[in-house]
């Protein structure tokens, strides 16, 4: 599995990624604003953040990211998204996530939010749980892919990574790790196959998409550690 999905290994460096996973004419990761940019930085080790900067178009600078070797799995996944031949729009929204349905009609999901149910130990984390360590809940994010094959699709030709703007600093970073380094990253490394990039609910609870589960757990866990530093 680690041969096909190189970044499932904890020791993969962005500058040394296999050519098959990097497009020299790749698109970009585009944070919609400064808050989105800060959210992405907060998922990374402090020492790596200087290599994640925006270009004149507001996109993450691909050449700068590629110039740096990091042991961070989150850095590597972000780097591969930046090198993919797809545009990834990162959007904070506190009202609705706009999507296109199977008929091509636009609609939206409401960005609901529940405050934390505990107020101490913000970095409490139990591996294997998708719930945020902050205790925040609701409809906290959504990743949408181009096309009309799913019930919820991107409204345009870009991948949309929506994160609930009501989330705390920590909650935003954790949930971007779920959506960006889980769903969007799996979409990237499977050749843009949205059928492989979503949750597979099991009758006994849990997620049947083992690759996605592993990606989300490791990304969220690293983000929690990076935020504590």
Region locations from a protein language model:
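Catalytic glutamate of the conserved HExxH
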Residues: 17, 175, 179-184, 188
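Residue-level detector of alpha-helical secondary structure
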Residues: 41, 79-83, 92, 216, ...
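Short turn/helix-capping motifs enriched in Asx and small/polar residues
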Residues: 1-52
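Sec-dependent signal peptide cleavage junction
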Residues: 34-39, 59-61, 226-229
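Stable alpha-helical elements in mature extracytoplasmic
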Residues: 36-40, 172, 176-177
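Conserved small-residue motifs centered on glycine
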Residues: 45-114, 124
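Post-HEXXH active-site segment of zinc metalloproteases
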Residues: 170-174, 186-228
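Active-site scaffold of zinc-dependent metalloenzymes
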Residues: 106-174, 186-187
């Amino acid at each position: 599995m680690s041969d096909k999905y190189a970044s499932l290994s904890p020791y993969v460096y962005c500058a040394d990624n296999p050519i098959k996973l990097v497009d020299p004419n790749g698109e970009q990761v585009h944070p919609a604003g400064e808050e989105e940019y800060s959210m992405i930085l907060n998922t990374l080790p402090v020492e790596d953040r200087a290599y994640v900067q925006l270009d004149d178009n507001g996109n993450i600078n691909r050449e700068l990211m590629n110039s740096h070797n990091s042991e961070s799995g989150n850095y590597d996944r972000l780097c591969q998204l930046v090198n993919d031949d797809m545009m990834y729009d990162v959007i904070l929204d506190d009202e609705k996530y706009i999507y296109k349905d199977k008929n091509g009609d636009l609609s939206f999901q409401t960005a609901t939010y529940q405050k934390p149910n505990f107020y101490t130990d913000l970095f409490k984390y139990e591996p294997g749980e998708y719930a945020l360590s902050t205790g925040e809940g609701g409809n906290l994010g959504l990743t949408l892919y181009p096309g009309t094959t799913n019930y919820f699709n991107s409204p345009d030709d870009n991948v949309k990574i929506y994160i609930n703007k009501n989330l705390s600093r920590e909650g935003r970073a954790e949930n971007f790790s779920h959506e960006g380094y889980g769903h969007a990253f799996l979409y990237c490394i499977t050749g843009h196959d949205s059928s492989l990039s979503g949750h597979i609910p099991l009758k006994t609870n849990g997620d049947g998409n083992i690759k996605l589960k592993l990606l989300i757990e490791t990304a969220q866990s690293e983000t929690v550690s990076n935020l504590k530093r």
